[in-house]
Amino acid sequence: MTPDWHSSLILTAYILIFLTGLPANLLALRAFMGRVRQPQPAPVHILLLNLTLADLLLLLLLPFRIVEAASNFRWYLPKIVCALTGFGFYSSIYCSTWLLAGISMERYLGVAFPVQYKLSRRPLYGVIAALVAWIMSFGHCTIVIIVQYLNSTEQVGTENQITCYENFTQEQLDVVLPVRLELCLVLFFVPMAVTIFCYWRFVWIMLTQPHVGAQRRRRAVGLAVVTLLNFLVCFGPYNMSHLVGFYLRQSPSWRVEAVVFSSLNASLDPLLFYFSSSVVRRAFGKGLLLIRNPASSMLGRGAKETVEGTKMDRGGSQAEGVQSSEFVTE
């Protein structure tokens, strides 16, 4: 079936997100894996690694969305595939919101209480925070599977064609709409409020300390702006559809487009990684060099680069003499 213009537009968006997000997140994964393997990694390393994994989960499931869009949003795969891909797709989105909130809290605590934070931070805290984010997202998104067994793939038209998690009966809506509202409140508005407060304080501290370098100030502002864009542009439309749907007692017609914006998160997060970590900045730089010169190879140099990156970050912090500006991943 040839996709119409609407499906073609969404199909193009999904393909672009996949092509830009996958290589960038794979580079970030390689960089963060090197950091986490080091003794006593900071909690933020673990959170950033898990955010990368959440993005990769979404990107690996994106081909199913691409096939769906190419088929004019008719679902020709088995019903269980609809349930499992939807579960993983939406779980990755909502896991990202609390991971972003956790990263913002770590940044704020690092600059507001630098001495206490440095003395008390433990890798275990990052592991616990990441586990909580995954458990909350997986637990809430089981609604996708529950609704599947309420026959969430509904026949449309007269050709025995079905859609995936799109057309609902009244029985399904009675289950879906209240849960979507709770998802919106607990997994979007609460972490967004935490993130806005933490980055507001974080940026204010960074900009008002005279001994913080201009480059670090720019990275602090960039980090806050990218994170805020993530919430407002990527997650905002999709979660607003939950509020509108609950009020109207039916799914709004623009939910499909809102899901596309949520997927854009996987392409926007690498910018956050870039502002967060000097290791990622070097990895992206080496990736560009590799594209320009395919004969060169980065294999086998990860551990050496990670050690060098650690020394460079620490040296830079000492040179600036700013205890409270350790927002750059060490």
Swiss-Prot record:
A GO MF label: G protein-coupled receptor activity
Single GO cellular component term: cell projection
Tissues in which the UniProt entry reports expression: Highly expressed in hematopoietic tissues, such as spleen and bone marrow, with highest levels in a subset of immune cells, including monocytes or neutrophils. Expressed in adipose tissues with high expression in differentiating adipocytes. Expressed by intestinal endocrine cells.
Pfam short name (any one): 7tm_1
Keywords: Cell membrane, G-protein coupled receptor, Glycoprotein, Immunity, Inflammatory response, Lipid-binding, Membrane, Receptor, Transducer, Transmembrane, Transmembrane helix
Predominant location category: membrane
KO phenotype (gene knockout): Knockout mice display altered protective intestinal inflammatory and immune responses but no gross developmental defects.
Extracellular side: 1-8, 65-79, 148-184, 241-255
Compositional bias ranges of the Polar residues kind: 320-330
Positions in the Cytoplasmic compartment: 30-43, 101-126, 206-219, 277-330
UniProt cross-references to Gene3D superfamilies, sorted A to Z: Rhodopsin 7-helix transmembrane proteins (1.20.1070.10)
Chain segments annotated as transmembrane: 9-29, 44-64, 80-100, 127-147, 185-205, 220-240, 256-276
InterPro entries, alphabetized: GPCR_Rhodpsn, GPCR_Rhodpsn_7TM, GPR40-rel_orph
Glycosylated residue positions: 151, 167
GO biological process assignments: cell surface pattern recognition receptor signaling pathway; cellular response to fatty acid; fat cell differentiation; G protein-coupled receptor signaling pathway; glucose homeostasis; leukocyte chemotaxis involved in inflammatory response; ligand-gated ion channel signaling pathway; lipid storage
Protein localization: Cell membrane
Signal sequence, start to end: none
Coiled coil: none
Membrane topology: Multi-pass membrane protein
SUPFAM superfamilies: Family A G protein-coupled receptor-like
Job description of the protein: G protein-coupled receptor that is activated by a major product of dietary fiber digestion, the short chain fatty acids (SCFAs), and that plays a role in the regulation of whole-body energy homeostasis and in intestinal immunity. In omnivorous mammals, the short chain fatty acids acetate, propionate and butyrate are produced primarily by the gut microbiome that metabolizes dietary fibers. SCFAs serve as a source of energy but also act as signaling molecules.
Subunit structure: Interacts with FCN1 (via Fibrinogen C-terminal domain).
Family per record: Belongs to the G-protein coupled receptor 1 family.
Protein name per UniProt: Free fatty acid receptor 2
